[in-house]
Amino acid sequence: MRNLMVLVIGLLGWTLTSAQTANTEKGKITGKLINTEGKAVVAATVTLQNATDSSLVKAVVSNKEGIYELENIAYGNYLLAVSSVGYEKTIKELSLHTGTAAMDFSIAPSSKTLSDVVIKTKKPLIEVKADKTVFNVEGSINAQGSNALELLSKSPGVLVDNNENITVKGKTGTKIYVDGKMMQLDNKDLAAYLKSINSNDIEAIEMISNPSAKYDASGNAGIINIRLKKNKKYGSNGSVNLGLVQGYTPKGNGSVNLNYRDKKINIFSNVGGNLGNYEEHLDLYRIQNDSIFDQKSRNVYKDKSINAKAGADLFLDSKNTIGVMATANFNDNTWGGNSATNIYYQPTGDYVKKLEAFNTIPGSRTNANLNLNYRYADTAGKTINVDADYGLFRGTGRSFQPNNYYAPNGDLLYQLTYRNYTPTDIDIYTIKADVEINKWKGKLGYGAKAAYVRTKNTFDFYNVENGTDVKQLSKSNSFDYKENVNAAYINYNRQLNAKWGLQLGVRAEQTNSEGVLTRADGIHQADDKVTRHYLDLFPSGALTWTVDKKNTLNLTYSRRIDRPTYQDLNPFENKLDELTYQKGNAFLKPQYTDNVELTHTFMGFINTSLSYSYVKDYSTMITDTANKNATFIQQRNLASQQIYGFSIGAPLPIAKWWNGYVNVWGNQQKFKGEFNGEKINRSYNLYGLYMQNTFNISKKKGVNAELSGWYNGKSVWGGTWVVKPMGGFDVGLQKSMFKGKGNLKASVTDVLFSQYWKSKTNFGGVYIDGEGKGESRTFRLNFTYRFGNNNVKAARERKTGLETEAGRIKG
């Protein structure tokens, strides 16, 4: 721990020292750019590089007179390069040893016409912007051959724990979007869906901490948007991708992308799949009442999944476009687990008995969405976007749970066997419209959305007696839930002057819901029907101050909401296994969060932020005693939460062949509340480190390498679980081939096999000490081949209307 803190402090010191060195006020370089006709060259890029290794020092753009200025440059020898579309790139040597050096350029027109030129740009792996951080997956070697869930764990500040809960910089409540559509799935179903998305089909992952009023208000820790690849070329083209993964067992994945585009229509399609087994080992040591349970488990997840997408855009004219898009995910998998639990009498430590339990959960999940879209855009800056969507989720949950109890001498005491049938049907209908116009010297946006959700859940519980399933009416039920959310927003954005920018917005959301529980035994309970109606306002705003050429400050605020998942509202008991029950909470309230963040951007690339969050009616999964020997789990509004945080991130252009990125974050979380008469007043200090390095080994041969790693200090989940520090690093190598059409990537993830979790909780009369390890260390081999027309033409980007309703489904 001490060594890690030294490393973190050293990295921060190095980053700040490097920034100060880059900013040493020594001298100035200025000049004028003209073409062969003597006219000024406007908006040309002027880059200053070290003469020794060609590493970037600074870059500016020429003004309308063709003048450029590079200020605060340390004395030394440099290369000065000028580039502009339609002109030849020009490079000159320059020595700065006095206060000001002048260097004018006369640049010649390019010998190639624009139609002859293929423009290629390479985005940095990590882009840090004032409002979001972008992980450009497409350019990462170590990201290939994995899936969307694994990629999230490799993103700056993101942690995916053993239960596949996603936290960002220690904060829970992040909402996951895919192509602008919120995934309305609970942890289990969301994880299964994300695992089915090949990393090779992902273009980028965007992390937005304080979304504007245009976005749905769900997500107290902001949103993560996974942008899938979309073909951007005229003509017929496509790509094929094949991947192999070797962990405990071999696995495979693949995808095919096809696209046709001309001036009138764009037709696109994609299909991909995953096949393989994933293994996890889990140990739990639990003390409850006067019993000790020492459990060791091995779980295997057998994954067979297919993702498909198809659609078309019809360009009616230069202003009007209509489109249709269908996406589907088919997941046919089996989760199987076996465990051995030694049970002791806690006061004396005497060995009482042993439980050998098995749990087999076969099932299929289907997630499909249909989107109809209309878009209008004119040259005056007016845009209109209308989306109509239908989404469905179908899950055929089943489980088979044999449990055998043995005496200390090994004799069989008794057997208990159960079978569950738990199908889930969810239908989602949404329609939304967004308008943006130039108004009051800025941009005015407004819109509305209506969403209707219907979910049906069945839980049938059976005792298996002499090979026959006997339905237990007192433990079986059905739960129907209906919800309607109507929303409207207005948002205004304006650059007030050269130094100040302003964004203000407010979103109103009206929620109507009804949950009805029907027990199979016909008994009514107090919470078998709960109806709610409430209206909320969610203001947001941002103020940007450009202090000078080197410093910019950005202050943002937003209010957010986290509604309960649909199944968390089902007030019936669900027997997960012999020792664990789960029950919903019909009276579970939404939690509300106020977020404030101040971001300082230095030299255009070093971002430092300070943040504060207050969460009202904080909800978490509580572990309690259902009876003497079983653990009882329920989602409850436990307490209030306060989070004080900081983060610093910067790209590091170390050398011409070596680029890096570092992000360090930390926060303090405070929880206050009461549970069963017990006062809660807890505080935790958390921190994390993320680093990414790319190496251009041979530009001529197209060989690149990547080294990335992360470390999270002690973290907290749900206010009651403390997770011990963990981390890991990956290495990868990439080779371009077949004249740039092919790409071969090889990588090793979690090289030191250090990504295992350990956590403890002592709450509600239950003490649990757990640890687990999955298949984090793997060897991955991935090959991609692109074919067809390679002329660059940007494709239309669009979000669907299912932005919120599709993350709250729980299977």
Question: What is the role of each PLM region?
Answer:
Residues 51-67:
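Short, acidic Ser/Thr/Gly-rich low-complexity loop/linker segments typical of extracellular
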Residues 424, 477-483, 532, 561-609, ...:
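Outer-membrane beta-barrel signature, preferentially recognizing the C-terminal barrel domain
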Residues 307-331, 359-517, 546-551, 604-610, ...:
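Face-selective signature of the C-terminal outer-membrane beta-barrel domain
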Residues 217-224, 232-282, 303-306:
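Outer-membrane beta-barrel translocator/receptor signature
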Residues 34-39, 45-49, 83-87, 97-141, ...:
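Short, acidic, small-residue-rich periplasmic hinge/interaction motif at the N-terminus
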Residues 71, 181-209:
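Short acidic/polar hinge/loop motifs at secondary-structure boundaries
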Residues 102-106, 148-151, 190-193, 207, ...:
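N-terminal periplasmic accessory domains that precede
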Residues 296, 428-432, 471-477, 589, ...:
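Outer membrane beta-barrel strand-and-loop segments of large Gram-negative receptors
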